[in-house]
């Protein structure tokens, strides 16, 4: 019996397949909003999984104890809440996601300083590539809105190294702060995925129940009353 690959390997393969279209996004945007929405939902749900980045970070930095895990998850770095995201219009939601992921992309670039050999933590660079792919799709989805969303075309930004500060925290505190940031990032992406799910459900529901949709579908359940029919006929009879 052949051994099954570990979960992390399966997740890495899934991520590689899902974000394979990243290089194509730079060549042009898809004109299919359902296709883009499907990709965005999948991307958000997968990156919302802590196994894609937080869990490898915890293991790599020796934070895998109940106390240290609690320190990571009890005080996450603040990201836009799910309630706030639900209240935004579609253009504002896309703009918020695009800007927030830009901040995450730069912050993950600063994480490089924690790893003398970046190949020791390949999940970090993979996560940054995935974020760039999501931002590309957000940009493409924004182009399909009417009026289109004004966000800059995605480009390869700088290396993302952080500027030196006057009071540098200790190594252990840097690890805890980074862990909190990653936990907040995963929670944010989970919220983004759930909002995108509602986009699909809400658009179909509102379209089916709209008066215009009923008229286009020839809904004959709503008929004028007999009195209104008689009045209309009398108005058509020449006098």
Swiss-Prot record:
Main location per the UniProt record: secreted
Signal peptide: 1-25
Localisation: Secreted
Keywords from the named record: Cleavage on pair of basic residues, Cytokine, Disulfide bond, Growth regulation, Secreted, Signal
Tissue specificity field: Widely expressed. Expressed at higher levels in liver, skin and spleen.
InterPro entries for the chain: 4_helix_cytokine-like_core, Leukemia_IF/oncostatin, Leukemia_IF/oncostatin_CS, OSM
Disulfide bond sites: 29-140, 72-179
GO biological process, one term: negative regulation of hormone secretion
Propeptide: 209-239
GO cellular component: extracellular space
Domain of life: Eukaryota
Molecular function GO terms recorded: cytokine activity; growth factor activity; oncostatin-M receptor binding
Processing after translation: Propeptide processing is not important for receptor binding activity but may be important growth-inhibitory activity.
Family membership noted in the UniProt record: Belongs to the LIF/OSM family.
Role description: Growth regulator. Inhibits the proliferation of a number of tumor cell lines. It regulates cytokine production, including IL-6, G-CSF and GM-CSF from endothelial cells. Uses only type II OSM receptor (heterodimers composed of OSMR and IL6ST). Involved in the maturation of fetal hepatocytes, thereby promoting liver development and regeneration.
PANTHER family tied to this protein: ONCOSTATIN M, ONCOSTATIN-M
Protein name per Swiss-Prot or TrEMBL: Oncostatin-M
